[in-house]
Design a protein with these regions (language model features):
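Catalytic cores and adjacent binding grooves of peptidoglycan-active enzymes
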Residues: 85-93, 97-101, 105-110
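Long, charge-rich alpha-helical interaction segments
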Residues: 130-133
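Hydrophobic alpha-helical bundle signature of multipass membrane enzymes
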Residues: 1-85, 106-116, 122-123, 128
Length: 133
């Protein structure tokens, strides 16, 4: 549910702005040149990978707040890797996080989302209790 909401916002922005990716703009290869052909005509702004990573980080942090710092650190680094690899500009990644945050805030009022989160919290509590022994 939240992944779909975040992707919708990202896809609409990508279609509107169609910003060239850094590797295409500067004629330099990414760290994974085999993916360049499929991405060269796909807009850079905002970063969809970052949006998904940030949404997952926010969700997992809500499910297990005691590990929130570690979870969000990984979510942050996942987005930054898109800049390091040459797929995105920093502003693309920042906008991906913003799309994720807005999408995550929007689903908070959904009864369906809250029901699924309640189920997930119970499942995680069981797993965490089992792993303590």
């Amino acid at each position: 549910m939240i992944g779909i909401d975040g992707n919708h916002a990202v896809d609409r922005a990508k279609a509107k702005y169609m910003r060239k990716r850094p590797f295409a703009q500067f004629h330099e290869h990414t760290l994974q040149p085999q993916f360049e052909a499929e991405l060269i005509n796909n807009g850079s702004y905002p970063s969809g990978h970052t949006c998904r990573g940030w949404i997952f980080g926010l969700t997992l942090t809500e499910l297990n707040p005691s590990r929130g710092n570690e979870i969000m650190k990984h979510a942050y680094e996942y987005g930054q890797s898109r800049v390091i690899c040459g797929y995105h500009y920093q502003s693309d990644v920042d906008a991906g996080r913003l799309c994720a945050s807005v999408g995550f805030a929007a689903v908070q009022s959904s009864d369906a989302f809250q029901k699924q989160m309640a189920k997930a919290k119970k499942e995680i509590a069981k797993v965490l209790a089992t792993n303590k022994h």
